[in-house]
Curated annotation (Swiss-Prot):
Membrane topology (UniProt): Lipid-anchor
A Pfam short name: LppC
Protein name: Penicillin-binding protein activator LpoA
Organism: Glaesserella parasuis serovar 5 (strain SH0165) (Haemophilus parasuis)
Signal peptide limits: 1-30
Gene Ontology cellular component terms for the protein in this record: periplasmic side of cell outer membrane
Gene that this sequence comes from: lpoA
GO BP of this protein: peptidoglycan biosynthetic process; regulation of cell shape
Lipid moiety-binding region (N-palmitoyl cysteine): C31
Function: Regulator of peptidoglycan synthesis that is essential for the function of penicillin-binding protein 1A (PBP1a).
């Protein structure tokens, strides 16, 4: 019987893949030229290749035109700008009928918005609104949303997406739209949101603004959030988000505060990585202080991770902190022992995935690079250029920066890799870097010094701000280095940003001013802080803790992100750049 069921399911799947495109082809084949044109008012279910093929096969001019219009629409949805332009150029505008002309003008606006052209808004305003179908009105608001997103106008983008809801025909699309709205609002400036006011009739926008402001105001007290959301639902009972709450907020409704009972700390306490494990444990112990919480400590070099997890659970551990080394993290992720227990892994690997009750925290260059992209946006930069050394560190950092910059601005990053730092000047000449641009330069202190001197002796000197990472910050950097780096901004963890603090002095004494070890000490301290707010990080989007390694928050897959402090070299000294 099981075999029959499997065969039956496979047969249904096969028939489904055959039936849908076949039925679509039969439907369109049954249409006369006029009928095909009428489908312009409806949703297009084929892909661009399907409609291009239909246009090539048709001998009727009107059919050809309509199929090409449909093809352009799908190419825009597929973000294929060049192909959309090429297909658009094949349309004979003089031979379009009224229905085709309306679709043609809407596509002009959509394509312009995709390319970031400002003319898109004017084209939309000129459209005869009363002649638009429901599907076309949806695309008008989609285009308005894209225009607003191109201009980083969060309020206009949310308003357009709120208006889209009435014209969407399926629950999946409406849920995805609500999730996108919430993502934009969560990432927006809180002060701006509190001052924003919805216009007359903008009920959807008003509801969204009320929801995000109430959420932000109560985020520091997560236990109140379920009640806050229920009160909002009573105020806006007909709002789209009442029926389809953003997925991120669903966990909030069932939130329970972290109750830390029984911790197991898994670290390398023998072998080559012993020194790393010991300093992290010292930071953890100092943060824990006199708390009577029972903490079991396991050496990850003493036994397989699966065995250590079993032993920890048998001894009552409900939260696992560690392991630290990447191979051990991969080993842990394949263990059945991590089910139904909180796990804070102290590293991330390419195999990291979303696992219930698992978060990942570490001092990765990727997290610092993402923080740099956010700094670029905060400083009002429009164009991002990254120069990085060839190799693992450079590639990981550059790609992480580019990914975050794309998420924040919908723009690409110009990435250049170098073998020798003095090559950077020639790499940047002719790149278009200038006003409105920022350079994220990565490397060691020596590489950064060579790179900066090369730029200072070229026509590119003082043409754009330069940023770098903490990798170049070392206690061995003397006055000459600081003078060479004049004007350069760099990210650093809070612990190392304030040498006058008691935490800095304590860590400095423990590790004899070794910045690398001080960072690991700070990591150990923050590990204790994260464990104590584990549910908050996992379930409360945007929840933050101010730690010694940065302002900590949970990103995708519960990767703990770190918002860094920013310092600047000025007059031979290091000053606050915040």
């Amino acid at each position: 019987m099981p075999t029959i069921l499997v065969q039956s399911y496979g047969f249904r799947q096969k028939m489904k893949t055959i039936f849908i495109p076949t039925a679509l082809a039969l439907l369109l084949a049954a249409c006369s030229g006029n009928k095909v044109t009428e489908t312009l008012k409806n949703e297009a279910y084929g892909n661009s290749e399907f409609y291009i093929n239909k246009a090539e096969q048709s001998r009727n001019i009107e059919e050809q035109q309509s199929y090409r219009l449909l093809a352009v629409r799908k190419l825009i949805e597929e973000n294929k700008v060049v192909e959309a332009q090429n297909t658009f150029s094949e349309i004979l505008v003089a031979k379009l009928n009224d229905e085709q002309k309306l679709e043609h003008r809407l596509l002009i606006a959509q394509l312009a918005a995709l390319q970031g052209n400002t003319e898109a808004q004017g084209v939309l305003r000129a459209l005869p609104q009363t002649l638009l179908s429901q599907s076309q009105r949806l695309r008008v608001y989609q285009t308005q949303a894209r225009i607003a997103e191109n201009q980083n106008d969060v309020i206009a983008a949310v308003n357009a997406r709120a208006l889209m809801d009435s014209y969407m025909t399926d629950t999946q699309s409406r849920q995805a739209n609500n999730d996108k709205i919430w993502e934009m609002l969560r990432n927006a400036n809180r002060g701006m949101l509190e001052k924003a006011v919805a216009g007359p009739g903008e009920i959807g926008l008003a509801g969204w603004l009320a929801l995000v402001v109430a959420y932000n105001q109560n985020m520091s007290n997560p236990a109140q959030l379920p009640q806050v959301i229920e009160m909002w639902k009573q105020q806006y009972p007909n709002h789209s988000a009442v029926l389809l709450l953003p997925i991120e907020l669903r966990n909030v409704s069932s939130f329970q505060q972290t109750q830390l009972n029984g911790v197991a700390l898994l670290l390398p306490l023998s072998g080559d990585a012993k020194i790393l494990g010991e300093i992290i444990k010292r930071g953890f112990d100092d943060a824990k202080g006199t708390t009577t919480m029972q903490v079991q400590v396991f050496d990850t070099d003493s036994a397989p991770i699966n065995d250590l997890l079993m032993q920890a659970k048998q001894q009552g551990a409900q939260t696992i902190i560690g392991p630290l080394l990447k191979p051990r993290v991969d080993e842990m992720l394949t263990s059945p022992e991590i089910s139904n227990i909180n796990v804070l892994a102290l590293n991330s690997t390419p195999n990291v995935r979303a696992v219930a009750k698992v978060c990942y925290y570490g001092l990765s260059p990727e997290a610092e690079a993402r923080s740099a992209a956010e700094r670029f946006l905060k400083d009002g930069l429009q164009h991002a250029v990254v120069v990085a050394p060839n190799g693992d560190f450079g590639t990981r950092s550059a790609e992480a920066f580019a990914q975050r910059w794309r998420q924040l601005t919908n723009r690409d990053t110009d990435i250049r890799y170098y073998n020798q730092a003095f090559e950077v000047t020639s790499l940047l000449q002719g790149s278009g870097i200038g006003q409105g641009s920022g350079l994220y330069a990565l490397g060691t202190a020596e590489q950064l010094s060579d790179l900066k001197q090369s730029l200072d002796n070229s026509p590119l000197a003082n043409q754009f701000p330069i940023y770098t990472s903490s990798r170049s910050n070392s206690p061995n950097n003397g006055p000459d280095f600081r003078l060479t780096m004049e004007g350069v901004k760099f990210s650093e963890i809070p612990l190392l940003s304030d040498p006058s603090s008691s935490e800095y002095k304590k860590a400095e004494q423990i590790v004899e001013s070794d910045f690398s070890m001080m960072r690991l000490y700070a990591m150990g301290s923050d590990t204790w802080s994260i464990a104590n707010k584990f549910n908050e990080f996992r379930q409360i989007p945007g929840y933050k803790v101010h730690g010694l390694t940065g302002v900590l928050s949970a990103g995708p897959n519960c990767n703990i992100e770190r918002e860094m402090n920013w310092l600047q070299y000025r007059g031979g000294s290091i000053v606050d750049a915040n």
